[in-house]
Amino acid sequence: MDSLASAAIPAAMPARPSGRADTAFFGHPVGLGWLSACELWERFSFYGMQALLVLYLSNHLFLPEHIGQVAGIEALRHAIESVTGPRSPQQLASAVFGLYAGFVYLTPLFGGVLADRVLGRTKTVVLGASLMALGHFLMAFEASFLVAIACLLIGVGCFKGNIAAQVGDLYAPSDKRRASAFQIFVLAVQIAVILAPLVCGTLGEKVAWHWGFGAAGVGMLIGLVVYLAGRRWLPPEPALGPRRAVDRAAGSAAAAERPSLTRRDKARVGVLVLLLPVLVLSIVGNQQYGNAFPLWSEKHMDMVLLGWQVPVTWLQAIDAFMSTATMLASIAFWRWWSKRRREPDELAKMGFGALVAAGGPALIMVAAGVVDASQGKVSLAWTLGYTLVNDIGFANILPVGLALYSRAAPQRLEGLMIGIYYLHLFVGNTFVGWLAGLLETMPGQAFWGLHAALVASAGVLLLAFRFVFRGVLAADDTP
């Protein structure tokens, strides 16, 4: 694949318009359009596969008659069960899904190093897209499942951070179009998140699993073709080789001139690190939406709408649509609030968000009680309630937390602290995979009540952190 990436990109590319002169794409550089289109198709493939994964594993691949065909699965199963104890097919599926969802947030750290020091961003993105396409197609074969997952994880690591960095590289540091550029970029992601479960999920559930995974692979190939077609509009690559050595030397000289960390800087770093376990608790209700919730819904939710059996994977599309709407509503609400009274700080918003988000699994706890009482199924209205309440709360947790770490981190450690912030998603998804394994052994009310309690406790702890460490984390210009 490394040779493929090298062959696909010519040594010299035609010059592209640069700076403010390039406004052909809705006032932005043409490269933004190509990068956004590529990201749309990459996210289509990613979320299409993810919508199917836990259902495919628990309902097919990890059943006794199939699991023996998977190369290397016994070693992985032994490693998981050495920590958790014996796992049923559903429990093993949830654990593997949790590990996959967690490592997705870890591998981009290595992809960034590969791009910065060895290949450059463009070649690394092409390598990542090629590996992801290969991984999606390998998912069609039972024996190659773990190889497919490895290709997907390495591919995401190579692709994700570097294509976002290329969006930023289209603009000069003082160019005020940068913020709106990332809004366009994120909008492309949201379109993909809505469409992917509808297409890949429907094919996987209604036709055959490999059709869904194949559709995801086709989406990734389209993304790769789009990226290569628009390569002349991509930003210039940072210098590698001897030039990079000069840049590193200059960077070392600049670093020597930076002031050392102050006592307050060290206190801030300590508080931000202490926050990580609380952040892990705050996301368990949201992250379970892609793991335990589809499994529970498949058994206990009436998925018939107007006489048609709605695929369980469509729940992911509902969540994507709702999360987009609630994110926009949250932004509008806080703008309205700030014009009338003082806007709360980040920890206050996050604490409020976690307390609201706890209502999502609490609603499913009630729904589980209805299931137990009636011995029947509950309507899709419970899904809409869970999604709406959870997404209102989550809109004030994840992005607000990112803003907190970006603002409060000492300037010389900002990149490191952002990376540390994302580690809570790695740990959180792994933890959620273990929690999802309890779905088979705990009553539904207790299972979802546990999640509501964990998220609510995170809300209380976030507000306690605000009370205790408000002075440490306050903005420098706070009176």
Feature roles, as predicted:
Residues 107-137:
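Conserved MFS/SLC helix-loop-helix module at the cytosolic interface between two early adjacent transmembrane helices
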Residues 130-147, 354-375:
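C-terminal ends and interior cores of transmembrane alpha-helices
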Residues 94-113, 317-330:
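Central cavity-lining transmembrane alpha-helices of secondary-active solute carriers
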Residues 104, 177-205, 212-223, 319-323, ...:
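Glycine-rich segments within core transmembrane alpha-helices of 12-TM secondary carriers
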Residues 1-31, 173-174, 201-307, 330, ...:
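Intracellular loop-helix junctions on the cytosolic face of multi-pass helical membrane proteins
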Residues 229, 308-339, 352-361:
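Transmembrane alpha-helices of Major Facilitator/SLC transporters
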Residues 158-172, 396-409:
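Intracellular juxtamembrane helix-capping segments at the cytosolic ends
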Residues 40, 135, 144-159, 373-396:
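Hydrophobic core of transmembrane alpha-helices in multi-pass small-molecule transporters
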